[in-house]
């Protein structure tokens, strides 16, 4: 329909609607509208959309702030003309826990439900043609369910194998390197391992473990190559059996430090938080500012937050993190028990056993540990206490007895740490001191066959300060330490980092200093600046810097990069120092099945080239084997069988079997949500949102049920040749209301292709002869 005709029809309709005769007195005559509307389906919906909602039971898709969250039965009564009244249980079943104080004045005592739409910032609407019920609620009005509401998912039997292969070549030789890491899941058990191979070496494996999460103990049973996790002794890796608590398993015991991560989303976006390449958290946020304060599993280091918008564009923010003292809430505890050997043998003389337990009291956390073997023993006690606004203090003491082939050493070690959160911006100060007597021996350094005297630590001082200035977009971090050894040697080190953003420009200064064992001091100072810019409607990023090192002198580097597409980018870089000059080009490409990169560089002495390919191979029972470029600790295979090439979730197109790999955060709610706007118009979801709480390294096959629909615009006549009256309910073969008759017998229908008949009141029509067409009104007779 062209614009001129469209405007004329709108004017005619306005004239008819504004007449004094109401719809009940005189039915609107639409005979002047031609039966053929061209190809614009919006014209049909514009003319025939009706806001009339009759009392009854409806099966509806429910949207919360424009995101489909599920499908539910909606009961509409005569009292719902002004505002829909929603029961607490109905909302809870959809994963919404409303703030009762927020909606307290809108609670209908007689009907025992909330008239949410009467609150000025909330809206409830029901489109009876599309069968969509929409809720618009501010963030302060509701919360999402915690993972205690959902059962753990150990996943399905399957495997997840991550691989990387690397080839490099220069003027003289070439080398090949391969790396594998993965797990095989059977029932509730996970067999995990990783291995690598250099060109001429044998394939080497390490970190091979068999583990199981035990919910009743809120911990993990681990068999194989693992590591101790105690608060009073230096942690060591060992081969054996271990049972240890896992704070990630229950919200009330998650004592890990979690910074507040803030940002602004331009659209409905996915926020992903990673550390060291591992996905710690991923969730969808609405447009506007967001705050995330429940990221778990963080360690000291740097977080990378990526905001992926609906159009596929991304923005990254790097967030430095340092731990504060570990205080447990009253009644909470951590434990770690194990038996094994520091080497991959089970010789009785070398087997050790250990235990560690932390327990939270009011304002105090107590720590205790014990380790013993035939030639070594260690015991420790400690406490972490809050001193209110002044911060937190921890003190501990250990004693050891170490017997080697020559003599027996006995000694003690004491430590004290102070930490304080300064201000509301996550600023942190940590001061630490540790003293060890000459006879004290850490088990990590103990060897019965080869006693060591030269590197026994005597004293250690540490200080860390991190400071944020949000108004100036400044982050400052200073760390310093000094160690003294009993052989009169010492080691000193310090790091300084200063970062500031000037709009989209990022500048940083980094410095380090070290000196130890009589060697000359070494220091480094560097300055780096990143500037994004546009040229010919293309987005580029420049990066340049200068460094000074005592040994190598001054060095310069400059480069730029471009994201040509969301899957492909390249980087050009040049560098110069007193000993060398070089230039390099690198490219990166990521598909739904793999990721690959290639680079070439040239310096004074040689030319180098390299290539890399990586990804994951995932197999799951009843879901087959698939290739993906995504790497994740826990993963869901989301499948809409028969729908290949559609990016219905995670922004990645489905493979030939309609599958997409979806990263999940361990022991947290993961809402597997389908983007219906990415699907063909004839697809209607039976279930949209599935919440999964995966265990560590779980592989879950999630099949999404859907109906293949046909869409029609019908003008229906009864047995006597009259059009079906306006307001007549249209039902499918299951008796569910799917639409209503509009003016002049016109109905807009979405019909399951498996439905053979549709009912208009007391008469019925066969669907076999209907055309799947929204651009033409079909006239049919009702039987």
From Swiss-Prot:
Q: What biological process terms from GO does the record include?
A: pilus assembly
* Keyword flag Transmembrane helix: no
Listed InterPro entries: Fimb_usher (IPR000015), Fimbrial_membr_usher_CS (IPR018030), FimD_plug_dom (IPR042186), PapC_N (IPR025885), PapC_N_sf (IPR037224)
The protein, known as: Outer membrane usher protein FanD
Q: Name the source organism.
A: Escherichia coli
Q: Write down the superkingdom of origin.
A: Bacteria
The keyword NAD appears for this protein:
no
**Record localization:** Cell outer membrane
Topology in the lipid bilayer: Multi-pass membrane protein
Secretion signal, residue range per the UniProt entry:
1-23
The UniProt entry's sequence similarity note says: Belongs to the fimbrial export usher family.
What is one cellular component GO term in this UniProt entry? Answer: cell outer membrane
User: What is the role of the protein in this entry?
Assistant: Involved in the export and assembly of K99 fimbrial subunits across the outer membrane.
* UniProt cross-references to PANTHER family, sorted A to Z: FIMBRIAL USHER DOMAIN-CONTAINING PROTEIN YDET-RELATED, OUTER MEMBRANE USHER PROTEIN
Query: What pairs make up the disulfide bonds?
Result: 763-782
Origin organism lineage:
Bacteria, Pseudomonadati, Pseudomonadota, Gammaproteobacteria, Enterobacterales
Supply one GO molecular-function term: fimbrial usher porin activity
Its keywords, alphabetically, are:
Cell outer membrane, Disulfide bond, Fimbrium biogenesis, Membrane, Plasmid, Signal, Transmembrane, Transmembrane beta strand, Transport
Database matches in NCBIfam families = PRK15213.1
